[in-house]
Amino acid sequence: MNLDRRRFLARSSATVAAAATGGLFTACSEKAEPGATSTEDEGTRFEISLAQWSLHRGLKEGKLDNLDYPKYTKETFDIHAIEWVNQFFFVEHATLGYQPKDQAYLAEMKKRVEDHGMTSVLIMCDRVGNLGNPDAVKRTAAVEGHYAWLEAAKFLDCHSLRVNAASDPTLNPEMQSDLCTEGLRRLSEKAATMGLNVIVENHGGLSSNGAWLAQAIKNVGLPNCGTLPDFGNFYVVKNRGDVAQYEKDKALYAGEPAYKEDEKGLAYDRYLGTKELMPYAKGVSAKAHDFDARGNETHTDFVKMMEIVKEAGYRGHVGIEYEGDQLGEVEGIQKTKALLERVFAMV
C-alpha cells in the first residue's frame, strides 16, 4: 500500500475515533428509526426482521416465489418484518442496471405484505451501477438508476434504501471517498424529498473498512444518509479460489495494519468496524454462517456485537441474514433467530 493510502486511512481512523468518543455521532443512533419502537422497555428495544437474502438459494432455485416471501416469513419463522432484496424483483435496463418490476407487480407485493400484517423495513439494492464511479456520466447514471428503487421503497412503506459505496478500487482511498460521497449526497438529497433514508452497508472493498465508510458518511453530511452495519461483511478482499486474482486484489491493501488475513480473505476487525459504523446506523444486519453445539455463531460473538449496538443507543430492527452453507436456509434462520432472542435478553 502506498504512503498516501496509509495516511488517508490513518486520518480516517483517528477522526472517527475522536468523534465517537466525543459524542459527535450520537444523534443518528439515539433517534428511533422510522417505524421502530421508541420505548425505554429493554424487552422491545430490538425487533427481529428477516433479510430476504437469507432465502436466496430457495428463491433462485424456484422453491420460493418473491411474492410469497411475506407469508412464508410469518408462517415459518414467526417474524413480522422483512428486508427486500432487489435481485428478486427486477428487470434489466441497458444503462441504469437493475430496475424494479412494473407498478402492478409492486402493488401485489404491497398487498401481500398488508394481507399478512407484515412490515417492509428496507430494500437492499445491488447492480445499479457504482455511486462512486470515476466516470461522471456513469456516476450520474448510477445515482439516477437508484431513483426508481427509492420510489419502490416509498411505495412499499420502507424507511430506507440500502445501497453500496463502490468506486474504482485502484484509486487511492481519498479519491474513492470523494467520489462515493458525491454520489451518496446526490442520492440522499433526492431521498430526503421522499422522506427516505439512504443507508450504506459494509459490502466489500473500502466500504468494509469501518473508519473509511464512517468518514464518507460524515462527509456526506446529511441526516438521512447512514449505515447498515453487517456483522460479517468486513472483508475488503475475499479469496474466491482464483489465486492470481486474489493476490492482485490484495496488493491494493498491502502494508495496512488494519487488516488481518485468514482463509476467507483480507479482513478489517469486525468489532471495531461495527463500533465505527453504529453511530450512523439506521439498521443492523446480523450476519450468521455457522453455529456450535450451544447455538453460538462461530465467527462472530453476538453478545459482544449487540453490546456495541446497545451502547450506540440504537433502537429498531436487527435483520437476520443467514448466509451459511452447512445448514439448510430454514434451520440457519431459526438458529440465528434463537441466538438473537437469547442475546437480546442478555444485553
Predicted segments, located by residue:
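Boundary/entry segment of secreted carbohydrate-active catalytic domains
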Residues: 41-65
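Catalytic domains of carbohydrate-active enzymes, especially glycoside hydrolases
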Residues: 67-87, 157
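Active-site acidic/histidine proton-transfer and metal-coordination neighborhood
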Residues: 12-25, 29-42, 71, 106-229, ...
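Acidic/histidine-rich catalytic cores of soluble enzymes
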Residues: 63, 81-82, 175, 181-307
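Short, acidic/polar
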Residues: 60-75, 140-151, 266-274, 302
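N-terminal secretory signal peptides and thylakoid transit peptides that target proteins
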Residues: 1-17
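Glycine-rich, proline-tolerant flexible connector loops at the mouths of alpha/beta enzymes
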Residues: 83-108, 168-171
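Hydrophobic faces of well-ordered beta-strands that scaffold small-molecule active sites
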Residues: 46-52, 80-84, 120-125, 161-163, ...
